[in-house]
Regions:
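Substrate-recognition element of Asp-dependent hydrolases with the DxDx(T/V) motif
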Residues: 46, 50-83, 92-101, 146
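Residue-level signal for short segments within beta-strands and strand-turn junctions
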Residues: 23-25, 99, 157
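Asp-based, Mg2+/Mn2+-dependent phosphohydrolase catalytic module
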Residues: 2-11, 77-94, 103-135, 139-193
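Active-site flanking residues adjacent to catalytic metal/cofactor-binding acidic residues
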Residues: 15-17, 64, 137-138
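Conserved protein kinase catalytic core
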Residues: 22-24, 29, 71, 144, ...
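Pocket-edge positions in alpha/beta enzyme catalytic cores
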Residues: 34, 38, 71, 110-111, ...
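Active-site neighborhood of HAD-like aspartate-dependent phosphohydrolases
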Residues: 2-59
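Anionic group-transfer/hydrolysis microenvironments
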Residues: 18, 67, 159
């Protein structure tokens, strides 16, 4: 391959972290992120799901809001420690993290989900075709972020009290179920070509 060769855009699975990859901490019916590695527990089926998705040639990109850092209640180093460990455990290609506290806390940005900034940044870095990619998440912010970036969306429904603002393209019980759904879609696409 020479320098003039243009590679086709790649596809990605954008994964929310808490509630998709790891078990969130639930307080008053709402999910919260773990604050240290000792609280971080990878959910059952996640390693297998990642292998299935990688087998179809998708990049795996974690896109996570960690606003407690911007709000001063969690050290950035704690989040980075968790992400370093996560990259050793799973075939994740990149972790995109928004550390901003959010507009309510005087820390607005374009990367905090539901804004699509993290997905746009990853798409530029990795040459990702967003229209051929998926955003998988367990909260309304994830679904809206996926739509805002032009991705297909899969909602993992854990029965939180928080309601969705938009209907996702698909629903699954967990990441392995989402991977199996994508596998079925891939097989249908292969049958058409």
């Amino acid at each position: 391959m020479n320098a003039d060769t243009i590679l086709p855009p790649c596809r990605a699975i954008f994964l929310d972290r808490d509630g998709v990859i790891n078990r969130p901490l639930i307080r008053s019916g709402k999910p919260y992120p773990p604050s240290n590695l000792g609280e971080f527990e990878i959910l059952p089926g996640v390693p297998e799901a990642c292998e299935v998705l990688k087998g179809f040639g998708f990049y795996l990109v974690v896109a996570t809001n960690q606003p407690d850092v911007g709000r001063g209640t969690l050290a950035r180093s704690a989040v980075e420690t968790i992400h370093g460990w996560l990259l050793q455990q799973l075939p994740i290609d990149r972790v995109m993290t928004c550390y901003h506290g959010g507009a309510t806390y005087g820390d607005p940005c374009d990367c905090r989900k539901p804004q699509p900034g993290m997905l746009f940044q990853a798409a530029e870095l990795l040459k990702i075709n967003l229209a051929e990619s998926f955003m998988i998440g367990d909260r309304w912010r994830d679904v809206d972020c996926g739509f805002n970036a032009g991705c297909k969306t899969i909602f993992i429904d854990w029965g939180y009290e928080e309601k969705l603002k938009r209907d996702p393209n698909f629903r699954a019980h967990d990441l392995l179920g989402a991977a199996q759904l994508i596998e079925q879609l891939e097989q249908r696409n292969d049958a058409r070509t």
